[in-house]
Amino acid sequence: MNRRDLLRYTVGAGLSAVSLPMLARQRLIIPRYRIGACDWSIGPAGSIDAFAVAKQIGLDGVQVSLNTAADHEHLRNPATQQTYIDAARKAGVGFSGLAIGLLNGIPYKSDPRTDEWVADSIDVAQALGVKNVLLAFFSENDLRNDKAGQQAVIDKLKAIAPKAERAGVVLGIESWLSAPEHVAIIDAVGSSAVKVYYDVCNSTVRGYDIFREIRDLGKDRICEVHIKENGHLLGQGQVDLNKVHQALNDIDYKGWLQIEGAVPPGQEVLPSYIANNKTVRGIFQ
């Protein structure tokens, strides 16, 4: 593993405390923005092959799925966690994030099974060296025009937030809601461990002024960012990435940018993501 790959793995997957002083002595600098991609965008959700693909693309990390429709346990199993850590080490690619996309079909707002998933995701995040856990609120878990569902989520997050706080893990809400609606939920929970997982494309599709929303939410309420397009390569669709870059700079955001979607119809994933990675690095780095 070369020096650059060592840094990637250290940041994404975590190394022992013994290794950290060594890195400090080497004065390795973590870049302001690190570039990852969702495992479900570069292959099937929950596939360990995502690390090898990410290496081919030139990514710094992979946002991995906690579980899948076929395997509700998956990364909640310590043995599976170790196989992922080994795969990340072999590829020289880190863990850029953790996501519970299965909540879209088995909703957190109403299905009690998901309480354990969210609680376990905090432990998994710690094991993988991940800071943020994406909680997905789309499809069956949509919070729009659902005050009862929103209140249920607030109550659940209030209950689990202390565990996340103790672990130093943030639970990120990704939904169709506007910035003010997200703020209302976050303020009601009242925990630094619950923030917005901001998707620039989803919010654009909803007609929100994403540049204003990013600035209004600020770095204290945005835990992480999806850089996404639907049916276009990045930089060729609806989202003005140069303005996104400026807005994120204005709020002093530092952290992962996760590429999602952004494959034109009929095009292959690998060349599309090589192009997407080049575009994002050209703008943000």
Question: Which residues does each predicted region cover?
Answer:
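Histidine-acidic metal/acid-base catalytic patches
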Residues: 2-34, 43-57, 179-285
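A generic structural signal for short coil/turn motifs at secondary-structure boundaries
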Residues: 71-74, 107-108, 144, 232-236, ...
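Hydrophobic faces of well-ordered beta-strands that scaffold small-molecule active sites
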Residues: 33-38, 62-64, 95-100, 133-135, ...
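Active-site-proximal loop/turn and secondary-structure-junction residues that shape catalytic pockets
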Residues: 41, 66-68, 101-104, 137-141, ...
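Short amphipathic alpha-helices and their capping/turn segments at secondary-structure boundaries
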Residues: 51-55, 78-90, 119-127, 211-216, ...
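Glycine-rich, proline-tolerant flexible connector loops at the mouths of alpha/beta enzymes
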Residues: 65-83, 140-144
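Active-site acidic/histidine proton-transfer and metal-coordination neighborhood
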Residues: 10-19, 25-29, 51, 85-97, ...
